C-alpha cells in the first residue's frame, strides 16, 4: 500500500491512521512526495500561500497543452491561483447558492431511471451533469449530449488517460465550447443570468468555467452517489433516513475525492517542516476527515454527528463552490434509486482506476 494506491483500495482507512500516527507531514520515499495526513497538516497546506494548485513551470499539463482541452484547463478556477481563480469563483459560487433543492429533486425525478446496472451507471455518471445542464438553460436532449461530452472531457484531468482518451477530451472540449457559445446567444436561464451579472471577465473565461462546473459535477457527484449506496448496503436500516443527513456523513466518512496535490512555489515552513520550492505535497483529505482531533469517534458512521468537519470539498480559497449542489443532486439521486426498488444487497463493485478518486463501478445488479 502507498498513499496513492490507497484511494481505490477496498479499505484504506486503517492505513491512513498509520500514516497519521507516523507524523502529520512526512516524506514518502517510495512515491517521492510529501504526504499530509493529519487534519492539522492538511489544513496548514491548503491555507498556505506558497502551496499552489499547479506547478509554476507547468500551469497546464504538457500532455494536453497544445489542444482545446488544455485551453479550457488553463482557465479553470480550480486550476489557478490569484485573480484567475478569484474572479470566476466570485461569479459562480454565490449564483449556485440560489438553486433550490426542490428544483433539483424535480429534475432528478424527471429522468427515466431503470433498476439495473445500466440504469445505475447513468444515474451516477450522466444524470448529475444533465441536471446542471438543465439549470444552465439547455434542453433535456442537449443535457444528455453535454453529459456524454463531459464524460469524455474529464479524461484530460487524469494522468492515467491514454492518447486516445486525450484526443477524445480535446474533441469534447471543442464541442462543449460550441454548445455554450450557442447557449450564451439565447435568453439566459436564471442561473446563467446570475453568473453573467457577477462575472468580471470575457466570454472564453466564462465558457471554460461552465465546462469546469460540469466536469466537477461529473467527478464529485458520481462518487458521492456510489459511496452512499455502499453505505446503505452495509447499513440497510438507514434506508428511510434523511438523505441529506446520509450524504453529509458519507462525504466525510468515505469521500469520492481522497486526495489532492499542492506544489510548493517558494521555500517555506509548514507544520514545523521545511519544504523547498518545487516539492510536491500529496494532501490526504480522506485521512484528515478520520483524524480524531477533527471529529470525535471518526470511525463511526453517525448521521447526527455534532459539529461535523470535513476536507472532502477542500478548504479555504479552493473550497469547492458547488458543494451544496453536489450534495443536493446526490441525495435526490440516491432517494430515486431506492424508490425504484433496487436490491442493494446484490450489488458488487470495484473502484474506477484513479490516482485520487474513489468512485465505485457497480455490476451484477438485479431488480
Regions found by a protein language model. Give the residues of each.
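Conserved cytochrome P450 K-helix E-x-x-R motif and the immediately C-terminal K′/meander segment
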Residues: 186, 240-273
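Cytochrome P450 proximal C-terminal region
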Residues: 16, 327-367
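Cytochrome P450
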Residues: 134-141, 229-240, 289-293, 340, ...
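Active-site substrate-recognition loop segments, prototypically the cytochrome P450 B′-helix/B-C loop
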Residues: 1-122, 129-147, 151, 155-159, ...
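Cytochrome P450 catalytic core segment centered on helix I
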Residues: 148-200
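Cytochrome P450 C-terminal beta-domain/meander region
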Residues: 197-203, 261-282
Amino acid at each position: 500500500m502507498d498513499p496513492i494506491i490507497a484511494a481505490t483500495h477496498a479499505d484504506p482507512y486503517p492505513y491512513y491512521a498509520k500514516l497519521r500516527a507516523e507524523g502529520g507531514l512526512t516524506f514518502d520515499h517510495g512515491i517521492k512526495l510529501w504526504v499530509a495526513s493529519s487534519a492539522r497538516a492538511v489544513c496548514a497546506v491548503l491555507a498556505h500561500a506558497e502551496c499552489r494548485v499547479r506547478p509554476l513551470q507547468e500551469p497546464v499539463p504538457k500532455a494536453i497543452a497544445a489542444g482545446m482541452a488544455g485551453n479550457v484547463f488553463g482557465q479553470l478556477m480550480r486550476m489557478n491561483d490569484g485573480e484567475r481563480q478569484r474572479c470566476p469563483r466570485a461569479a459562480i459560487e454565490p449564483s449556485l447558492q440560489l438553486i433550490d433543492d426542490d428544483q433539483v429533486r424535480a429534475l432528478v425525478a424527471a429522468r427515466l431511471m431503470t433498476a439495473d446496472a445500466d440504469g445505475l451507471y447513468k444515474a451516477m455518471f450522466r444524470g448529475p451533469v444533465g441536471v446542471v445542464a438543465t439549470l444552465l438553460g439547455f434542453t433535456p436532449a442537449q443535457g444528455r449530449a453535454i453529459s456524454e461530452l463531459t464524460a469524455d472531457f474529464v479524461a484530460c484531468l487524469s494522468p492515467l488517460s491514454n492518447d486516445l482518451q486525450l484526443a477524445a477530451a480535446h474533441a469534447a472540449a471543442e464541442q462543449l465550447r460550441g454548445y455554450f457559445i450557442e447557449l450564451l446567444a439565447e435568453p439566459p436561464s436564471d442561473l446563467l443570468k446570475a453568473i453573467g451579472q457577477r462575472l468580471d471577465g470575457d466570454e472564453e473565461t466564462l465558457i471554460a468555467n461552465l465546462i469546469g462546473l460540469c466536469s466537477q459535477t461529473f467527478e464529485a457527484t458520481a462518487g458521492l452517489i456510489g459511496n452512499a449506496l455502499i453505505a446503505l448496503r452495509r447499513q440497510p436500516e438507514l434506508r428511510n433516513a434523511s438523505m441529506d443527513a446520509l450524504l453529509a456523513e458519507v462525504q466525510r466518512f468515505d469521500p469520492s475525492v481522497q486526495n489532492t496535490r499542492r506544489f510548493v512555489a517558494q521555500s517555506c515552513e509548514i507544520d514545523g517542516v521545511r519544504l523547498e520550492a518545487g516539492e510536491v505535497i500529496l494532501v490526504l483529505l480522506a485521512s484528515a476527515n478520520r483524524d480524531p482531533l477533527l471529529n470525535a469517534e471518526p470511525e463511526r458512521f453517525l448521521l447526527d454527528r455534532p459539529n461535523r468537519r470535513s476536507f472532502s470539498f477542500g478548504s479555504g480559497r479552493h473550497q469547492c463552490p458547488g458543494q451544496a449542489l453536489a450534495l443536493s443532486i446526490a441525495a435526490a439521486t440516491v432517494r430515486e434509486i431506492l424508490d425504484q426498488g433496487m436490491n442493494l444487497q446484490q450489488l458488487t463493485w470495484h473502484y474506477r482506476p484513479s490516482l485520487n478518486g474513489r468512485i465505485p463501478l457497480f455490476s451484477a445488479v438485479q431488480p
